[in-house]
Regions:
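Structural preference for solvent-exposed beta-strand-turn elements
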Residues: 1-253
Length: 253
């Protein structure tokens, strides 16, 4: 594997992909970021069995290939590089990064032990990125931070045709925001419960594009899904949904 990529493009993509890596991963392999060089682009991926992130960026690929390296170390190195093209090459069990006079070496992690990322859920509609960001910011502040009540750490998403409702409560506060979106099917009805911190991260990191595509998959029964996905500007992320019966707070409005 051998490629050249712009420093700023690489640093931003690595930072975004590695942002959700666990500080204390259940397995050391989950601290890695997978880099795939193919065609005229790089694909960077991370996964911790709950949240996956995937970012595609343009690059000059001389030799196609795939490798797994420490995500946080790669992020730190990328940010410290000068503003010049970065040359990356796989040499046996190490990856070398050369940028101007800077030279770094990263140990390779066992790629065959890395879990497969979940497939991106089928898109069910799109929403303006700034509208989503504002709504999540307004509602998520009411979500609980007490992990002893896990359901209340989530934001309930109710989809009813062309309308989406976000709800959150910590038993003392209650927030709701209704907003319009562009559903693929105007008769769609879905409910999803997403951890507030994950939804906040998505809303903050996907504001550069005009639209964010939303997807749901893994339906176990009508109106119920197990995975939610968001796609925007070459970035894709998925999250498992929370299980359980959310308090019936809708009737209070």
């Amino acid at each position: 594997m051998k490629f050249t990529v712009a420093r700023d493009v690489l640093a931003e993509a690595v930072s975004w992909t590695a942002r959700a890596l666990p500080v204390r991963p259940a397995s050391p392999i989950l601290a890695g970021v997978r880099i795939k060089a193919e065609g005229d682009e790089l694909t960077l991926s991370s996964f911790d069995y709950e949240v996956s992130a995937n970012s595609q960026i343009p690059a000059t690929v001389d030799e196609a290939g795939e490798v797994l390296v420490s995500g946080r170390l790669l992020a730190d190195i990328s940010k410290s590089l000068p503003s010049k093209p970065v040359s990356v090459e796989l040499d046996g069990q190490k990856v070398t990064l050369v940028c101007g006079s800077s030279h770094f070496t990263l140990a390779v992690m066992p790629l065959d032990e890395y879990p497969l990322l979940p497939a991106q859920p089928t898109g069910i509609g799109a929403i303006d990125s700034s509208t989503l960001s504002q709504a999540v910011s307004q509602v998520s502040i009411a979500a609980s931070r007490d992990d002893t009540l896990p359901l209340l750490t989530g934001v309930r998403i109710e989809i009813n045709g062309p309308a989406i409702t976000l709800l959150a409560t910590d038993r003392y506060r209650l927030a709701m925001r209704e907003l319009d979106w562009e559903p693929a099917d105007t008769s769609i009805e879905e409910v999803a419960l997403v951890k507030a911190r994950i939804l906040q991260d998505v809303a903050k990191s996907m504001t550069s594009g005009a639209k964010v595509e939303v997807g749901l998959s893994g339906e176990s029964q009508p109106g119920a899904s197990s995975l939610i996905g968001f796609t925007a500007q070459g970035r894709r992320t998925t999250s498992t949904l929370m299980d359980g019966d959310y308090p019936a707070v809708r009737r209070l409005f």
